[in-house]
Regions:
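Short solvent-exposed loop/turn micro-motifs enriched in small/polar/acidic residues
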Residues: 54, 111-112, 188-190
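N-terminal start-of-chain detector that recognizes signal peptides
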Residues: 30-36, 44-47, 102-108, 163-170, ...
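Aromatic- and glycine-enriched beta-alpha-beta binding-site module
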Residues: 64-66, 70-150
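Short, extreme N-terminal leader segments that mark the start of a protein/domain
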Residues: 1-76
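A contiguous, surface-oriented mixed alpha/beta subdomain in the mid-to-C-terminal portion of proteins
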Residues: 120-271
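Short, glycine/acidic-rich beta->alpha junctions
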Residues: 53, 105, 211
Length: 271
């Protein structure tokens, strides 16, 4: 039987990790849900670069500050505020039928959210092999009577194969995202971001800092060979998707305002 992953800081959402095993979890099942309670009070979600075109239509895309910058989808402008999912983890932008089943959703849910509660992890620090693990505290996986099987005998079910493939693709997307950020840094295109919003009736603007964004002025001043490189690599439309998405910050602010969750004018770190 595979041993548990070695102790290390757990990623966002995860409370614990166990390797998925046909010996231990032979009778376990996955049950569907339209709720994501683990999202409650989370305002910044990791995003892969290839998701930028879809995500920019709905949410601001920023980068975390510091040398280890990562792209983040902003679900709120303040710690603990999520304007797209309610406290029960249900999407607020959906149309439901009389039974409460979602029949239409215009919202893009980032892959990082869809991946949970699964994760590819190294069971030993020096191992090169990644094993499919899961968070045992999740309420969607367990020894249920209902739901889809994880194993057929001692073999992974079609569902488990699909989960494994999704996680494999996510890891590859993560590597491409890290390379994208590195190239932005090599070109010195990331700068400290700041957004100032003057709300009606407020004596001071609401100022949000503590994140990074692409410096559009420097982008426009790139040398011909540098610009040609990011055009040929496919980076340029992704950069503009990020820049276009920043207009969504005001929409998120308006949503927070309607929810009564605007913190008084101050400096706020969203990342």
């Amino acid at each position: 039987m595979a041993s548990a992953p070695q102790p290390q800081p757990l990623p966002l959402f995860y409370n614990d990790l166990q390797p998925l095993s046909s010996q231990v979890h032979a009778d376990w099942r996955v049950r569907p849900t339209d709720r994501a309670k683990f999202l409650a009070n989370h305002h910044a979600i990791p995003l892969t670069v290839e998701e930028f075109p879809q995500a920019q239509r709905f949410m601001p895309i920023i980068f975390s500050s510091g040398p280890d910058a990562v792209p983040l989808a902003l679900f709120g402008l303040n710690e603990g505020v999520n304007v797209f999912f309610d406290e029960e983890g249900q999407l607020t932008q959906v149309i439901r039928d009389e039974q409460g089943t979602i029949i239409e959703s215009s919202f893009y849910v980032p892959a990082y959210i869809r991946r949970y509660p699964y994760l590819l992890a190294r069971l030993q620090p020096n191992s090169e092999e990644l094993s499919l693990c899961f968070d045992p505290t999740a309420d969607t996986i367990g020894a249920f009577e209902e739901g889809d099987k994880l194993f057929e005998g001692d073999q992974p079910s079609e569902l488990t194969k699909a989960i494994l493939e999704f996680n494999r693709q996510f890891e590859e997307a993560g590597q491409r995202t890290a390379q994208f950020v590195k190239e932005l840094q090599d070109l010195d295109l990331l700068m400290e971001g700041e957004v100032s919003i003057q709300a009606d009736g407020a004596s001071q603007p609401f100022v949000y800092r503590g994140f990074s964004m692409v410096n559009e002025e420097k982008l426009n001043q790139l040398r011909g060979d540098q610009l040609r490189k990011i055009v040929q690599s496919g980076m340029l439309p992704l950069i503009y998707a990020h820049l276009f998405s920043l207009s969504q910050i005001r929409e998120v602010f308006a949503r927070q305002q309607r929810m009564g969750k605007i913190v008084g004018p101050q400096l706020v770190n969203p990342a």
